[in-house]
């Protein structure tokens, strides 16, 4: 499944105020918009440093995750601007370190990796080279010690009811500016991150439904069925019975994080 995810792409329709001609491109779901800056600067003849959608400055997240969050019509029409410039390399490596720390209780895996392997990891993302990426990620995902926690981030629309607030101490927030667009896209969201063990207290494999129920019990009252909300990952609805560790190994983004987006049911 991981190779199929890396092969999937999002069609983009990129515009700049200086030109009436758009830049059309298919971008891998696991890639980052910032990697397009050199070719876009050359195409439009203008220095560019940010992307926006419906007036909202897009964060430095994987393209597929941004698409899952905002749920735009395709091709996705985004605008170029001169907002704050992200250091995409440092951002990516720091995120890899965070995921490594979450899995093992330390970041020794990535910190002890050779410079050659570290460079190959980053280059594989830039080049969408799954073969090289898989070789390096296999090292990170199979340390000598047992897996401690799953690097899981839950993106929750802020319009969710107050009663769906996660367990105290388990959440952070990340909000985009409000907009007059229809409320269905997740224009404003919270990012929830907490410690999820790969097994339950009864030593059973932890499922996605079990994790959601433990973090957001009111929003996900059942461990087996989506009653009030469901989650999407890489553009697809994920069954609650899916084993979390299997998802981590097959469907994490290139930085090692399993990013799921909550979608409220009618």
From Swiss-Prot:
Glycyl lysine isopeptide (Lys-Gly) (interchain with G-Cter in atg12) cross-link site: 97
Keyword Metal-binding tagged: no
Low complexity compositional bias, start-end: 158-179
Residues annotated as signal peptide: none
InterPro entries: Atg5, ATG5_HBR, Atg5_HR, ATG5_UblA, Atg5_UblA_dom_sf, ATG5_UblB
GO CC, any one term: Atg12-Atg5-Atg16 complex
Cellular compartment(s): Preautophagosomal structure membrane
GO terms (BP aspect): aggrephagy; autophagosome assembly; cellular response to nitrogen starvation; mitophagy; piecemeal microautophagy of the nucleus; protein transport
Post-translational modification (record): Conjugated to atg12; which is essential for autophagy.
Keyword tags: Autophagy, Isopeptide bond, Membrane, Protein transport, Transport, Ubl conjugation
The keyword Ubl conjugation is annotated on this UniProt entry: yes
Pfam families noted in UniProt: ATG5_HBR, ATG5_UblA, ATG5_UblB
Coiled-coil region(s): none
Region of interest called Disordered, as start-end residue ranges on this chain: 158-182
Membrane topology reported for the UniProt record: Peripheral membrane protein
Similarity comment: Belongs to the ATG5 family.
Assembly and binders: Conjugated with atg12.
Main function: Involved in cytoplasm to vacuole transport (Cvt) and autophagic vesicle formation. Autophagy is essential for maintenance of amino acid levels and protein synthesis under nitrogen starvation. Required for selective autophagic degradation of the nucleus (nucleophagy). Also required for mitophagy, which eliminates defective or superfluous mitochondria in order to fulfill cellular energy requirements and prevent excess ROS production.
Name of the featured protein: Autophagy protein 5
